[in-house]
Amino acid sequence: MKIFREVFELGNKEIILETGGMARQADGSVTVSCGNNVVLVTTVVKKSVADGTDFFPLSVHYLEKTYAAGKIPGGFLRREGRPSEEQILISRLIDRSIRPSFPDGFFNEIQIVATVLSYDGAFSPDILALIGASASLAISGAPYDDVVAGVRVGYTNGKYILNPNKQDLRDSDLDLVVSGTDDAILMVESEANSLPESVMLGGILYAHKHLKTIINSINRLAKVASKPRIEYSIYQINKFLKSQIKSQFFGEIKNAYTIASKQERNLKLNAIRKNVLEYIFSSDVDGNEYTEKEILEAFHDIEKDLVRSNILEGKPRIDGRCTETIRPINVKIGVLPGVHGSALFTRGETQALVVTTLGSDRDAQLVESLDGIEKCRYMLHYNFPPYSVGECGMVGMAPKRREIGHANLAKRATQAVFPNEEAYPYVVRVVSEILESNGSSSMATVCGSSLSMMDAGVPIAEPVAGIAMGLIKDGAKYAVLSDILGDEDHLGDMDFKVAGTRYGVTALQMDIKIKGISREILEQALEQARAGRLHILGIMNEVIKEHKEAVSDVAPQIHVMNINPAKIKDVVGRGGATVKGIVEKTGAQIDTSDSGEVKVFAKDKKSMDMAVAMIEEIVAEVEEGQVYKGKIVKLLDSGVFVNLLGSQDGYLPFSEIEQAGMKTNSLVEGQGLEVLVQNIDRGGRVKLSLVAR
């Protein structure tokens, strides 16, 4: 058993790549170690293309084992179940990083599995998994010539931090992951605290500069440990077939792409496709028999060439816009009467209905990970039903990877402006229902989420808007597109989503389909996105630019009280009897903590006020010189103890009672008296006198 090893440094941390010791029946197998973190990444490549496959079936699975952190899973079965949303997001991150490096037309199935075997809690294993995926591919024999690497970058006090640990990220204004090849950037994923575009661009370039060290190490490992290159074929469009279709139908296709409406355009194109199939099947084009798949692939290639060439030649886009024009926007808030907050955001043929719901601490999501159980106060969910694109399909199923990814992007975009628990004790759930989609539904979700939360009275620091940028590139010629359509995303070379406030960027997500882009293109895309974002924010601000001061009449009420910690036991009562009584009488939900914090959550203001008043009565402190009504709770030889505020007793001597003209032999327990607080000594003992009748 021969083991090969490569060692390099990343941000003053030693990273070790090793192959030959584990999972040797996989085509590629690499362990990546940093400190006590160990990730095993395997690659298996099918040696032939499955019948009927007309796409690249790459699948990436990132898995965390609880034993890696010395823990036993929860649940009845006590074993790992389906991947968490975080694991799915990391799987997508790896997939998006490596997919552009494969040749067009390569359709062999590839499966990559990254398994976290050991975890020290200091660093997230996601970057190790990404590096391991690239290394295992490089030695697997797959056609993977442009080796990819990825790094994370933070930004604190005006300085970039390479490979930050989790504590660094907590103090950082930026969490940026960049992947790419030696000479090109392929993928960007980030969350930021409204940073300027210049800082974001600087972070991307800083990250790319440090990829070379990782790539060189992977190449050295591949040089000594790589398997022979597999034999594979590349699917190619039949050029003669394409020319025949173009000669007969190009004029019709060209006219179809002048129709701005997506539905009308698709109806026209479907009719042309039907005619193309009939023409090819009924005529002896060149003596060959073509399949429907081959014909439609050639037709699609003509569409792609047409749309791209029109844009590069400066002609109007599919819907008649120029490269920088944003589609018409319509904004409405408060569109649903029975919810806590709502917004309907429409941009062209993309529409998001976004609803905000307020809840208490008990509604917070508990997220289990290798770090333990974390309470999540802000949830954002994204739903993409089939009717949004005029199709039939499965409804009510678990969210797909794409839906999870879009929800995460929108949440990261708005996380920077979301209030902390001290400022806003509510738990918030935002749901985006995509009602129509023709490009950029995730950015519509960002805009709608900001509007919906402001409508619900959530005190977000600033409104947030998002825009999706595209790219058409052919050699040295290129065009950056603002607010891309679905077809422009599908037929273009880049999907670059930018979200932020008027002050700066809060989230970036970039995916490239070509072999990377230059600094010049990045700068133009960021600047064009900034102009588009400010335009969208201006329209949103005309409807609502600050959160509503009060929550909706149908929203629950929440009140936070900070009382003397010693009084918590009085609020709770013996065996919880007191707090249960308040809950039963008012219908409110009450949470207490040993620090003295009491949270009261009620369905309406009346229940809230009643519960707060009852708690205030229990925890109220008596004051010298004040008169109180109390009840005798204990008789002594020299006087009586009188309960004043439910939780505090005072001593009333018989001499004071007699001085007020009352006979002491008539006193009984439970009898009501009106008393004056004469004195409270250092020990908290209260001396009373009787108020004369």
Swiss-Prot record:
Segment forming the signal sequence: none
Annotated SUPFAM superfamilies: Eukaryotic type KH-domain (KH-domain type I), Nucleic acid-binding proteins, Polynucleotide phosphorylase/guanosine pentaphosphate synthase (PNPase/GPSI), domain 3, Ribonuclease PH domain 2-like, Ribosomal protein S5 domain 2-like
Domain S1 motif, chain residue ranges per copy: 625-693
Catalytic function, reaction form: RNA(n+1) + phosphate = RNA(n) + a ribonucleoside 5'-diphosphate
EC number: 2.7.7.8
Location of the KH domain: 556-615
InterPro entries: ExoRNase_PH_dom1, ExoRNase_PH_dom2, ExoRNase_PH_dom2_sf, KH_dom, KH_dom_type_1, KH_dom_type_1_sf, NA-bd_OB-fold, PNPase
Keywords assigned by UniProt, alphabetized: Cytoplasm, Magnesium, Metal-binding, Nucleotidyltransferase, RNA-binding, Transferase
Needed co-factor(s): Mg(2+)
MF GO annotations: 3'-5'-RNA exonuclease activity; magnesium ion binding; polyribonucleotide nucleotidyltransferase activity; RNA binding
Main location: cytoplasm
CDD domains: KH-I_PNPase, RNase_PH_PNPase_2
Keyword Cytoplasm: yes
Record-linked SMART domains: KH, S1
GO biological process: mRNA catabolic process; RNA processing
Gene Ontology annotations for the cellular component aspect, listed alphabetically: cytosol
Family designation: Belongs to the polyribonucleotide nucleotidyltransferase family.
Function: Involved in mRNA degradation. Catalyzes the phosphorolysis of single-stranded polyribonucleotides processively in the 3'- to 5'-direction.
Protein name, per record: Polyribonucleotide nucleotidyltransferase
Organism: Francisella tularensis subsp. tularensis (strain SCHU S4 / Schu 4)
Phylogenetic placement of the source organism: Bacteria, Pseudomonadati, Pseudomonadota, Gammaproteobacteria, Thiotrichales
Gene label: pnp
